[in-house]
Amino acid sequence: MEIATILSGAGAVVAVTVTSVASFPSGKACAESPGARRTAMSEEQVVRNCAPTLAGLKTGNLFACPYENREDLLDFLRSLNRRLGKKGVRAVPLRIRQDRALIYLYRPARLEKDLSCASCEALLSEFGYNCRGGSRCLTRLARRLKQQEDFPHEIGLFLSYPPEDVKGFLEHKPCKCVGCWKVYENEE
């Protein structure tokens, strides 16, 4: 089953069961045994790491993907974008290192909306972002990821974290509760 058939309607995920794994053009498929080094990105890996975004519950997901051939990785992402673009989803490599890529799968329209709120714009401007468009902000984020070893903390805004929580984390405030992320303002 391909990702294109997993998605339906307004982006809802239906029965996320991957029964086949796509391989890169070179023919190298993802290693399927637990603990085996993955040699390529697969649709299964995308579904496992990005189900909340594919289901329309989040703006974006981020995951690391080992790879052996850069061109195969980029070909796979182009193919994925041809299929997912129809559903309003896009995948981009934010950082590519020697044998590992950091992939961001997101909903561009939702990212545009998320980053256009006043509190997001103010927070991002502190880090040199010009938030007149999600693609510009993504370009700046990718540049920051390449320039520094640590993750830029504003990345939470690209992953559907509330701006108040990202700001609270940056200011080292005491959190009110911990779940999938630390909550600093509204616990609900």
Language-model-derived ranges and their functions:
Residues M1-A31:
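Gram-positive cell-envelope targeting signals
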Residues G27, S33-R97:
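A structured, charge-rich N-terminal accessory region that forms the first stable segment of a protein
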Residues N130-S135, P163, V178:
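Short, surface-exposed acidic
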Residues G133-E149:
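Helix-hairpin-helix/helix-loop-helix acidic hairpins
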